[in-house]
Each structure stands twice: as structure tokens, then as C-alpha cells.
């Protein structure tokens, strides 16, 4: 039963991705990072080291992917600030994992929630535009 549910979730995510705008994909990645961080924190608190490592590793992968998508040439100060925040988050997650410190994960969760909240406020008419089209 569990395998069937996982397969269904994967098909659902795959179908959402295939029809998603770049804006929506970033929203999904941020939501996925938050979810993995919460799961990793719970595993940390329960002493479940394998699950903690797997979930925090996935959160790191997502954050590193988001960071790699930044356009430093087009994004100006916003891209530079996000780059610094993503770097901070990667370091915090790594240290939280090493020190087994859930509070450090709470800090990262709060930061990414704030970034996602700002991202969610972007009006729909801008969801498919490139930096050149916006005039950045």
C-alpha cells in the first residue's frame, strides 16, 4: 500500500512539474525544502539518524539547486542577498546535522518561509517573464 501511495505522489508531482511555470517550480521547490527540513527536524528529535540524514540531504539538494538558478548578472542586489541567504542556510543545515541542533533548523525554516512568502506575492502576470522582459 505504501509503495502505491508513493508512486501516486510521484506521478502527481511529475504531472504538476510538466505543466508548471518557472515561478511555480520555484514555489514547489521551496515548499519541498520546508517539508524536508520539518521531517529532518522530527527525525533528529526522535533520534532517527538515517531518516534525519536523508531528509536534510534532500533539503540541502533543493536549496543548492535554488542557489544555482540565481542570475547574478540580471538579479542585482536581490540575487546577491539570496545567494548569501542560501549559503547561510546550507551552512546552518550542515551544522545542525553535525550538532544535532533542531533550533538551527528552525532558523532555516523561518528564512525559507519568508523567502517563499515574498515569492508567492509576485503577481501572476510576471510568472513566465524572463529578467530581460521585466527590465532587470
UniProtKB/Swiss-Prot annotation:
Pfam families, sorted: FliS
Q: Entry's InterPro entries?
A: FliS (IPR003713), FliS_sf (IPR036584)
Query: Where would you say this protein principally sits, based on its record?
Result: cytoplasm
Q: Is Magnesium one of the keywords?
A: no
For this UniProt record, the keywords arranged alphabetically read as follows: Bacterial flagellum biogenesis, Chaperone, Cytoplasm
Gene3D superfamilies on file: Flagellar protein FliS
A GO biological process held by the record: bacterial-type flagellum assembly
From the Swiss-Prot or TrEMBL record, state where the protein is found: Cytoplasm, Cytosol
Domain of life, per lineage: Bacteria
| GO terms under cellular component | cytosol
Member of which family? Belongs to the FliS family.
Protein name as catalogued: Flagellar secretion chaperone FliS
Q: Which organism is it from?
A: Vibrio cholerae serotype O1 (strain ATCC 39315 / El Tor Inaba N16961)
Q: What is the lineage of its organism?
A: Bacteria, Pseudomonadati, Pseudomonadota, Gammaproteobacteria, Vibrionales
Q: Which gene encodes it?
A: fliS
